[in-house]
Amino acid sequence: MAAACGFAVANVYLNQTLLVDIAGTFGAAEAEAGIVTTLTQVGYALGNLLIVPLGDIFERRRLILALLGVASLSLVSAALSGSLTWLIVSNFCLGLTTVIPQIIVPLAAGMADERNRGKVLGTVAIGLVCGILGARLVSGLVDSLWGWRSMYWISFGCMLLLALLIRLRFPVSKGTASLPYRRLLLSLGPLFMKEDVLRRSCLSQGMIFGSFSVFFTTIGFLLQAPPYSYSSAVVGLVGLVGIGGAIATPIIGRVIDRKGASFANKMCMLAALISFLIAVTAGHWLPALILAAFLLTVGTQANQVACQANIFSLSASARSRLNGLYMVCTFLGGALGSYLGVWAWTRWHWTGVCICGMVMIAAGMSAALGTKNGGNSHKR
């Protein structure tokens, strides 16, 4: 399950280190190329709203295979794109159908008992972190060697392989809700309004993930301009420092099981804020940027585990819908962060980017400070 999550989620992030060369191919400005990343995340958010809730009513393996088929076609379309608009539409469709990890995560949570749910979610999150980091690293290297289109073809091959592995090895799992699709979607609004823990978790992760997108959407612009003037391959390598996120998520899972998700949530927000304080004060010193990237990745990914542990304790029969709502808000925050990051870069460069990230984290911290543990509150 962790491996499947990693390969699938990579599709959402592979374009972040390609933006400079995409802009060059189509003669576009950096801000125009940044729309590729923004619309990918908007598509992912809509997919979480419209598709992920189906995991509560349909057999999940069949649903995942169907999504892989459409995502594969979107990758081919992106690789063949003849204009920036074509590429943007292809990436939007790719984001819309690459919601496979968010169908798998509630399944993994349901297979775990309450005492070990944080640990299980932390293990699955390792795959997500590795997919995010791998996407940036591999896409940067591939772009520097063979061009950005080659990355889409490689990802297409990975999706075909993943479909085969899921068909052969993934467990059959049927949803437990018996609602028509229309009623399923109509149930989302009341569910969101009913659960205060869900709303606060959505705001917390949406804002910290927005700050994450602010940073990683624009760091390529910073590192490929003077005084750095690095290639896209080096930009991808810088993102590799976030491997700390993969190391930290199982640790956070154990902290959640012992001290509660809300405690972990607050610590993650603090780590993210510190990362931007480092980036804004020493952004033109590469070791400081690497440390900032490390702390931000750890904080963002670990916060996701903490928030999901909280919301999955609310209702066993609605886990896909809870996760869908949660991820909608997460990736709307990510899309907002991508847009604001490029906007801030074009006006105030790196200082503006960092201030934008800190404002988003401050908004997320306001939610984290008022959050109590969900249904499996820590009682030790």
Per-segment meaning from a language model:
Residues 262-307:
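C-terminal transmembrane helical hairpin of 12-TM major facilitator-type secondary transporters
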Residues 170-202:
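Juxtamembrane intracellular "pre-TM" segments in multi-pass secondary transporters
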Residues 86, 123-168:
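Helix-loop-helix hairpin linking two adjacent transmembrane segments in secondary transporters
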Residues 48-59, 248-261, 345:
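Helix-to-loop junctions at the C-terminal end of transmembrane segments
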Residues 46-84:
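Conserved MFS/SLC helix-loop-helix module at the cytosolic interface between two early adjacent transmembrane helices
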Residues 62-76, 156, 263-278, 358:
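Structural signature of the two symmetry-related core transmembrane helices
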Residues 90-127:
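Cytoplasmic helix-loop-helix junction between adjacent transmembrane helices
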Residues 100-112, 302-315:
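Intracellular juxtamembrane helix-capping segments at the cytosolic ends
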